[in-house]
């Protein structure tokens, strides 16, 4: 195990007293995994989390006098933000599939790219969630599922309006309803057929909304953050 290797590397011993596990030990372990073992920060955090569980048990059994993790904060893993470029988004919009279900999934994904809605929010949209303001702009008014906070999104782009019109039917729901698992599976097929190597998910669609759609149209970052339902701009 990594912890045994580290102890031998640092102390040239197979074991050490638990009371030697202080804050510096954790920091050194983190550095060792990064530099000597070339681990990613995600992997490092998992290994440190396992050590934390051992310390928790040791504390309960009074085998250690203090908690070395008291001041420790896991380091943030750098994640690559994935979103579609304008060219990729245009390619997706222009593509017509022979399969009706693929066209439906494509349309729902594009709708998300132009509204920033999550999966459950999008597929639970009802006609009653749409309201027009004094200027005639159509808005979505709904509660965000994760936080149960009300949110509103103006439909300022033609794409979501065209999609709503396309699927206007007797149903109370705005869009075709597709299970999450099936939706994601068909998104893979769509990406493959277009030669897009990025993973298409609702998360990718929200990032596309924030970057390609909003920021590239010179919409202020504060507005982008608000439309995505973030309490902080950095989220």
Label the model's feature ranges.
Residues 1-37:
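Basic/aromatic-enriched alpha-helical hairpins
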Residues 2-9, 35-69, 120:
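N-terminal DNA-binding recognition helix of tyrosine site-specific recombinases/integrases
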Residues 37, 104, 115, 198, ...:
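Flexible coil/turn residues that form the inter-helical turn or adjacent wing/linker of helix-turn-helix
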Residues 41, 45, 64-119:
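Basic, Lys/Arg- and aromatic-enriched nucleic-acid-binding interface segment
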Residues 60, 110, 114, 120-121, ...:
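C-terminal catalytic core of tyrosine-transesterase DNA break-rejoin enzymes
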Residues 78, 145-189:
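C-terminal catalytic core of Y-nucleophile DNA break-rejoin enzymes
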Residues 83, 144-148, 180, 228-235:
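Catalytic-site neighborhood detector that most strongly recognizes the C-terminal catalytic loop/helix
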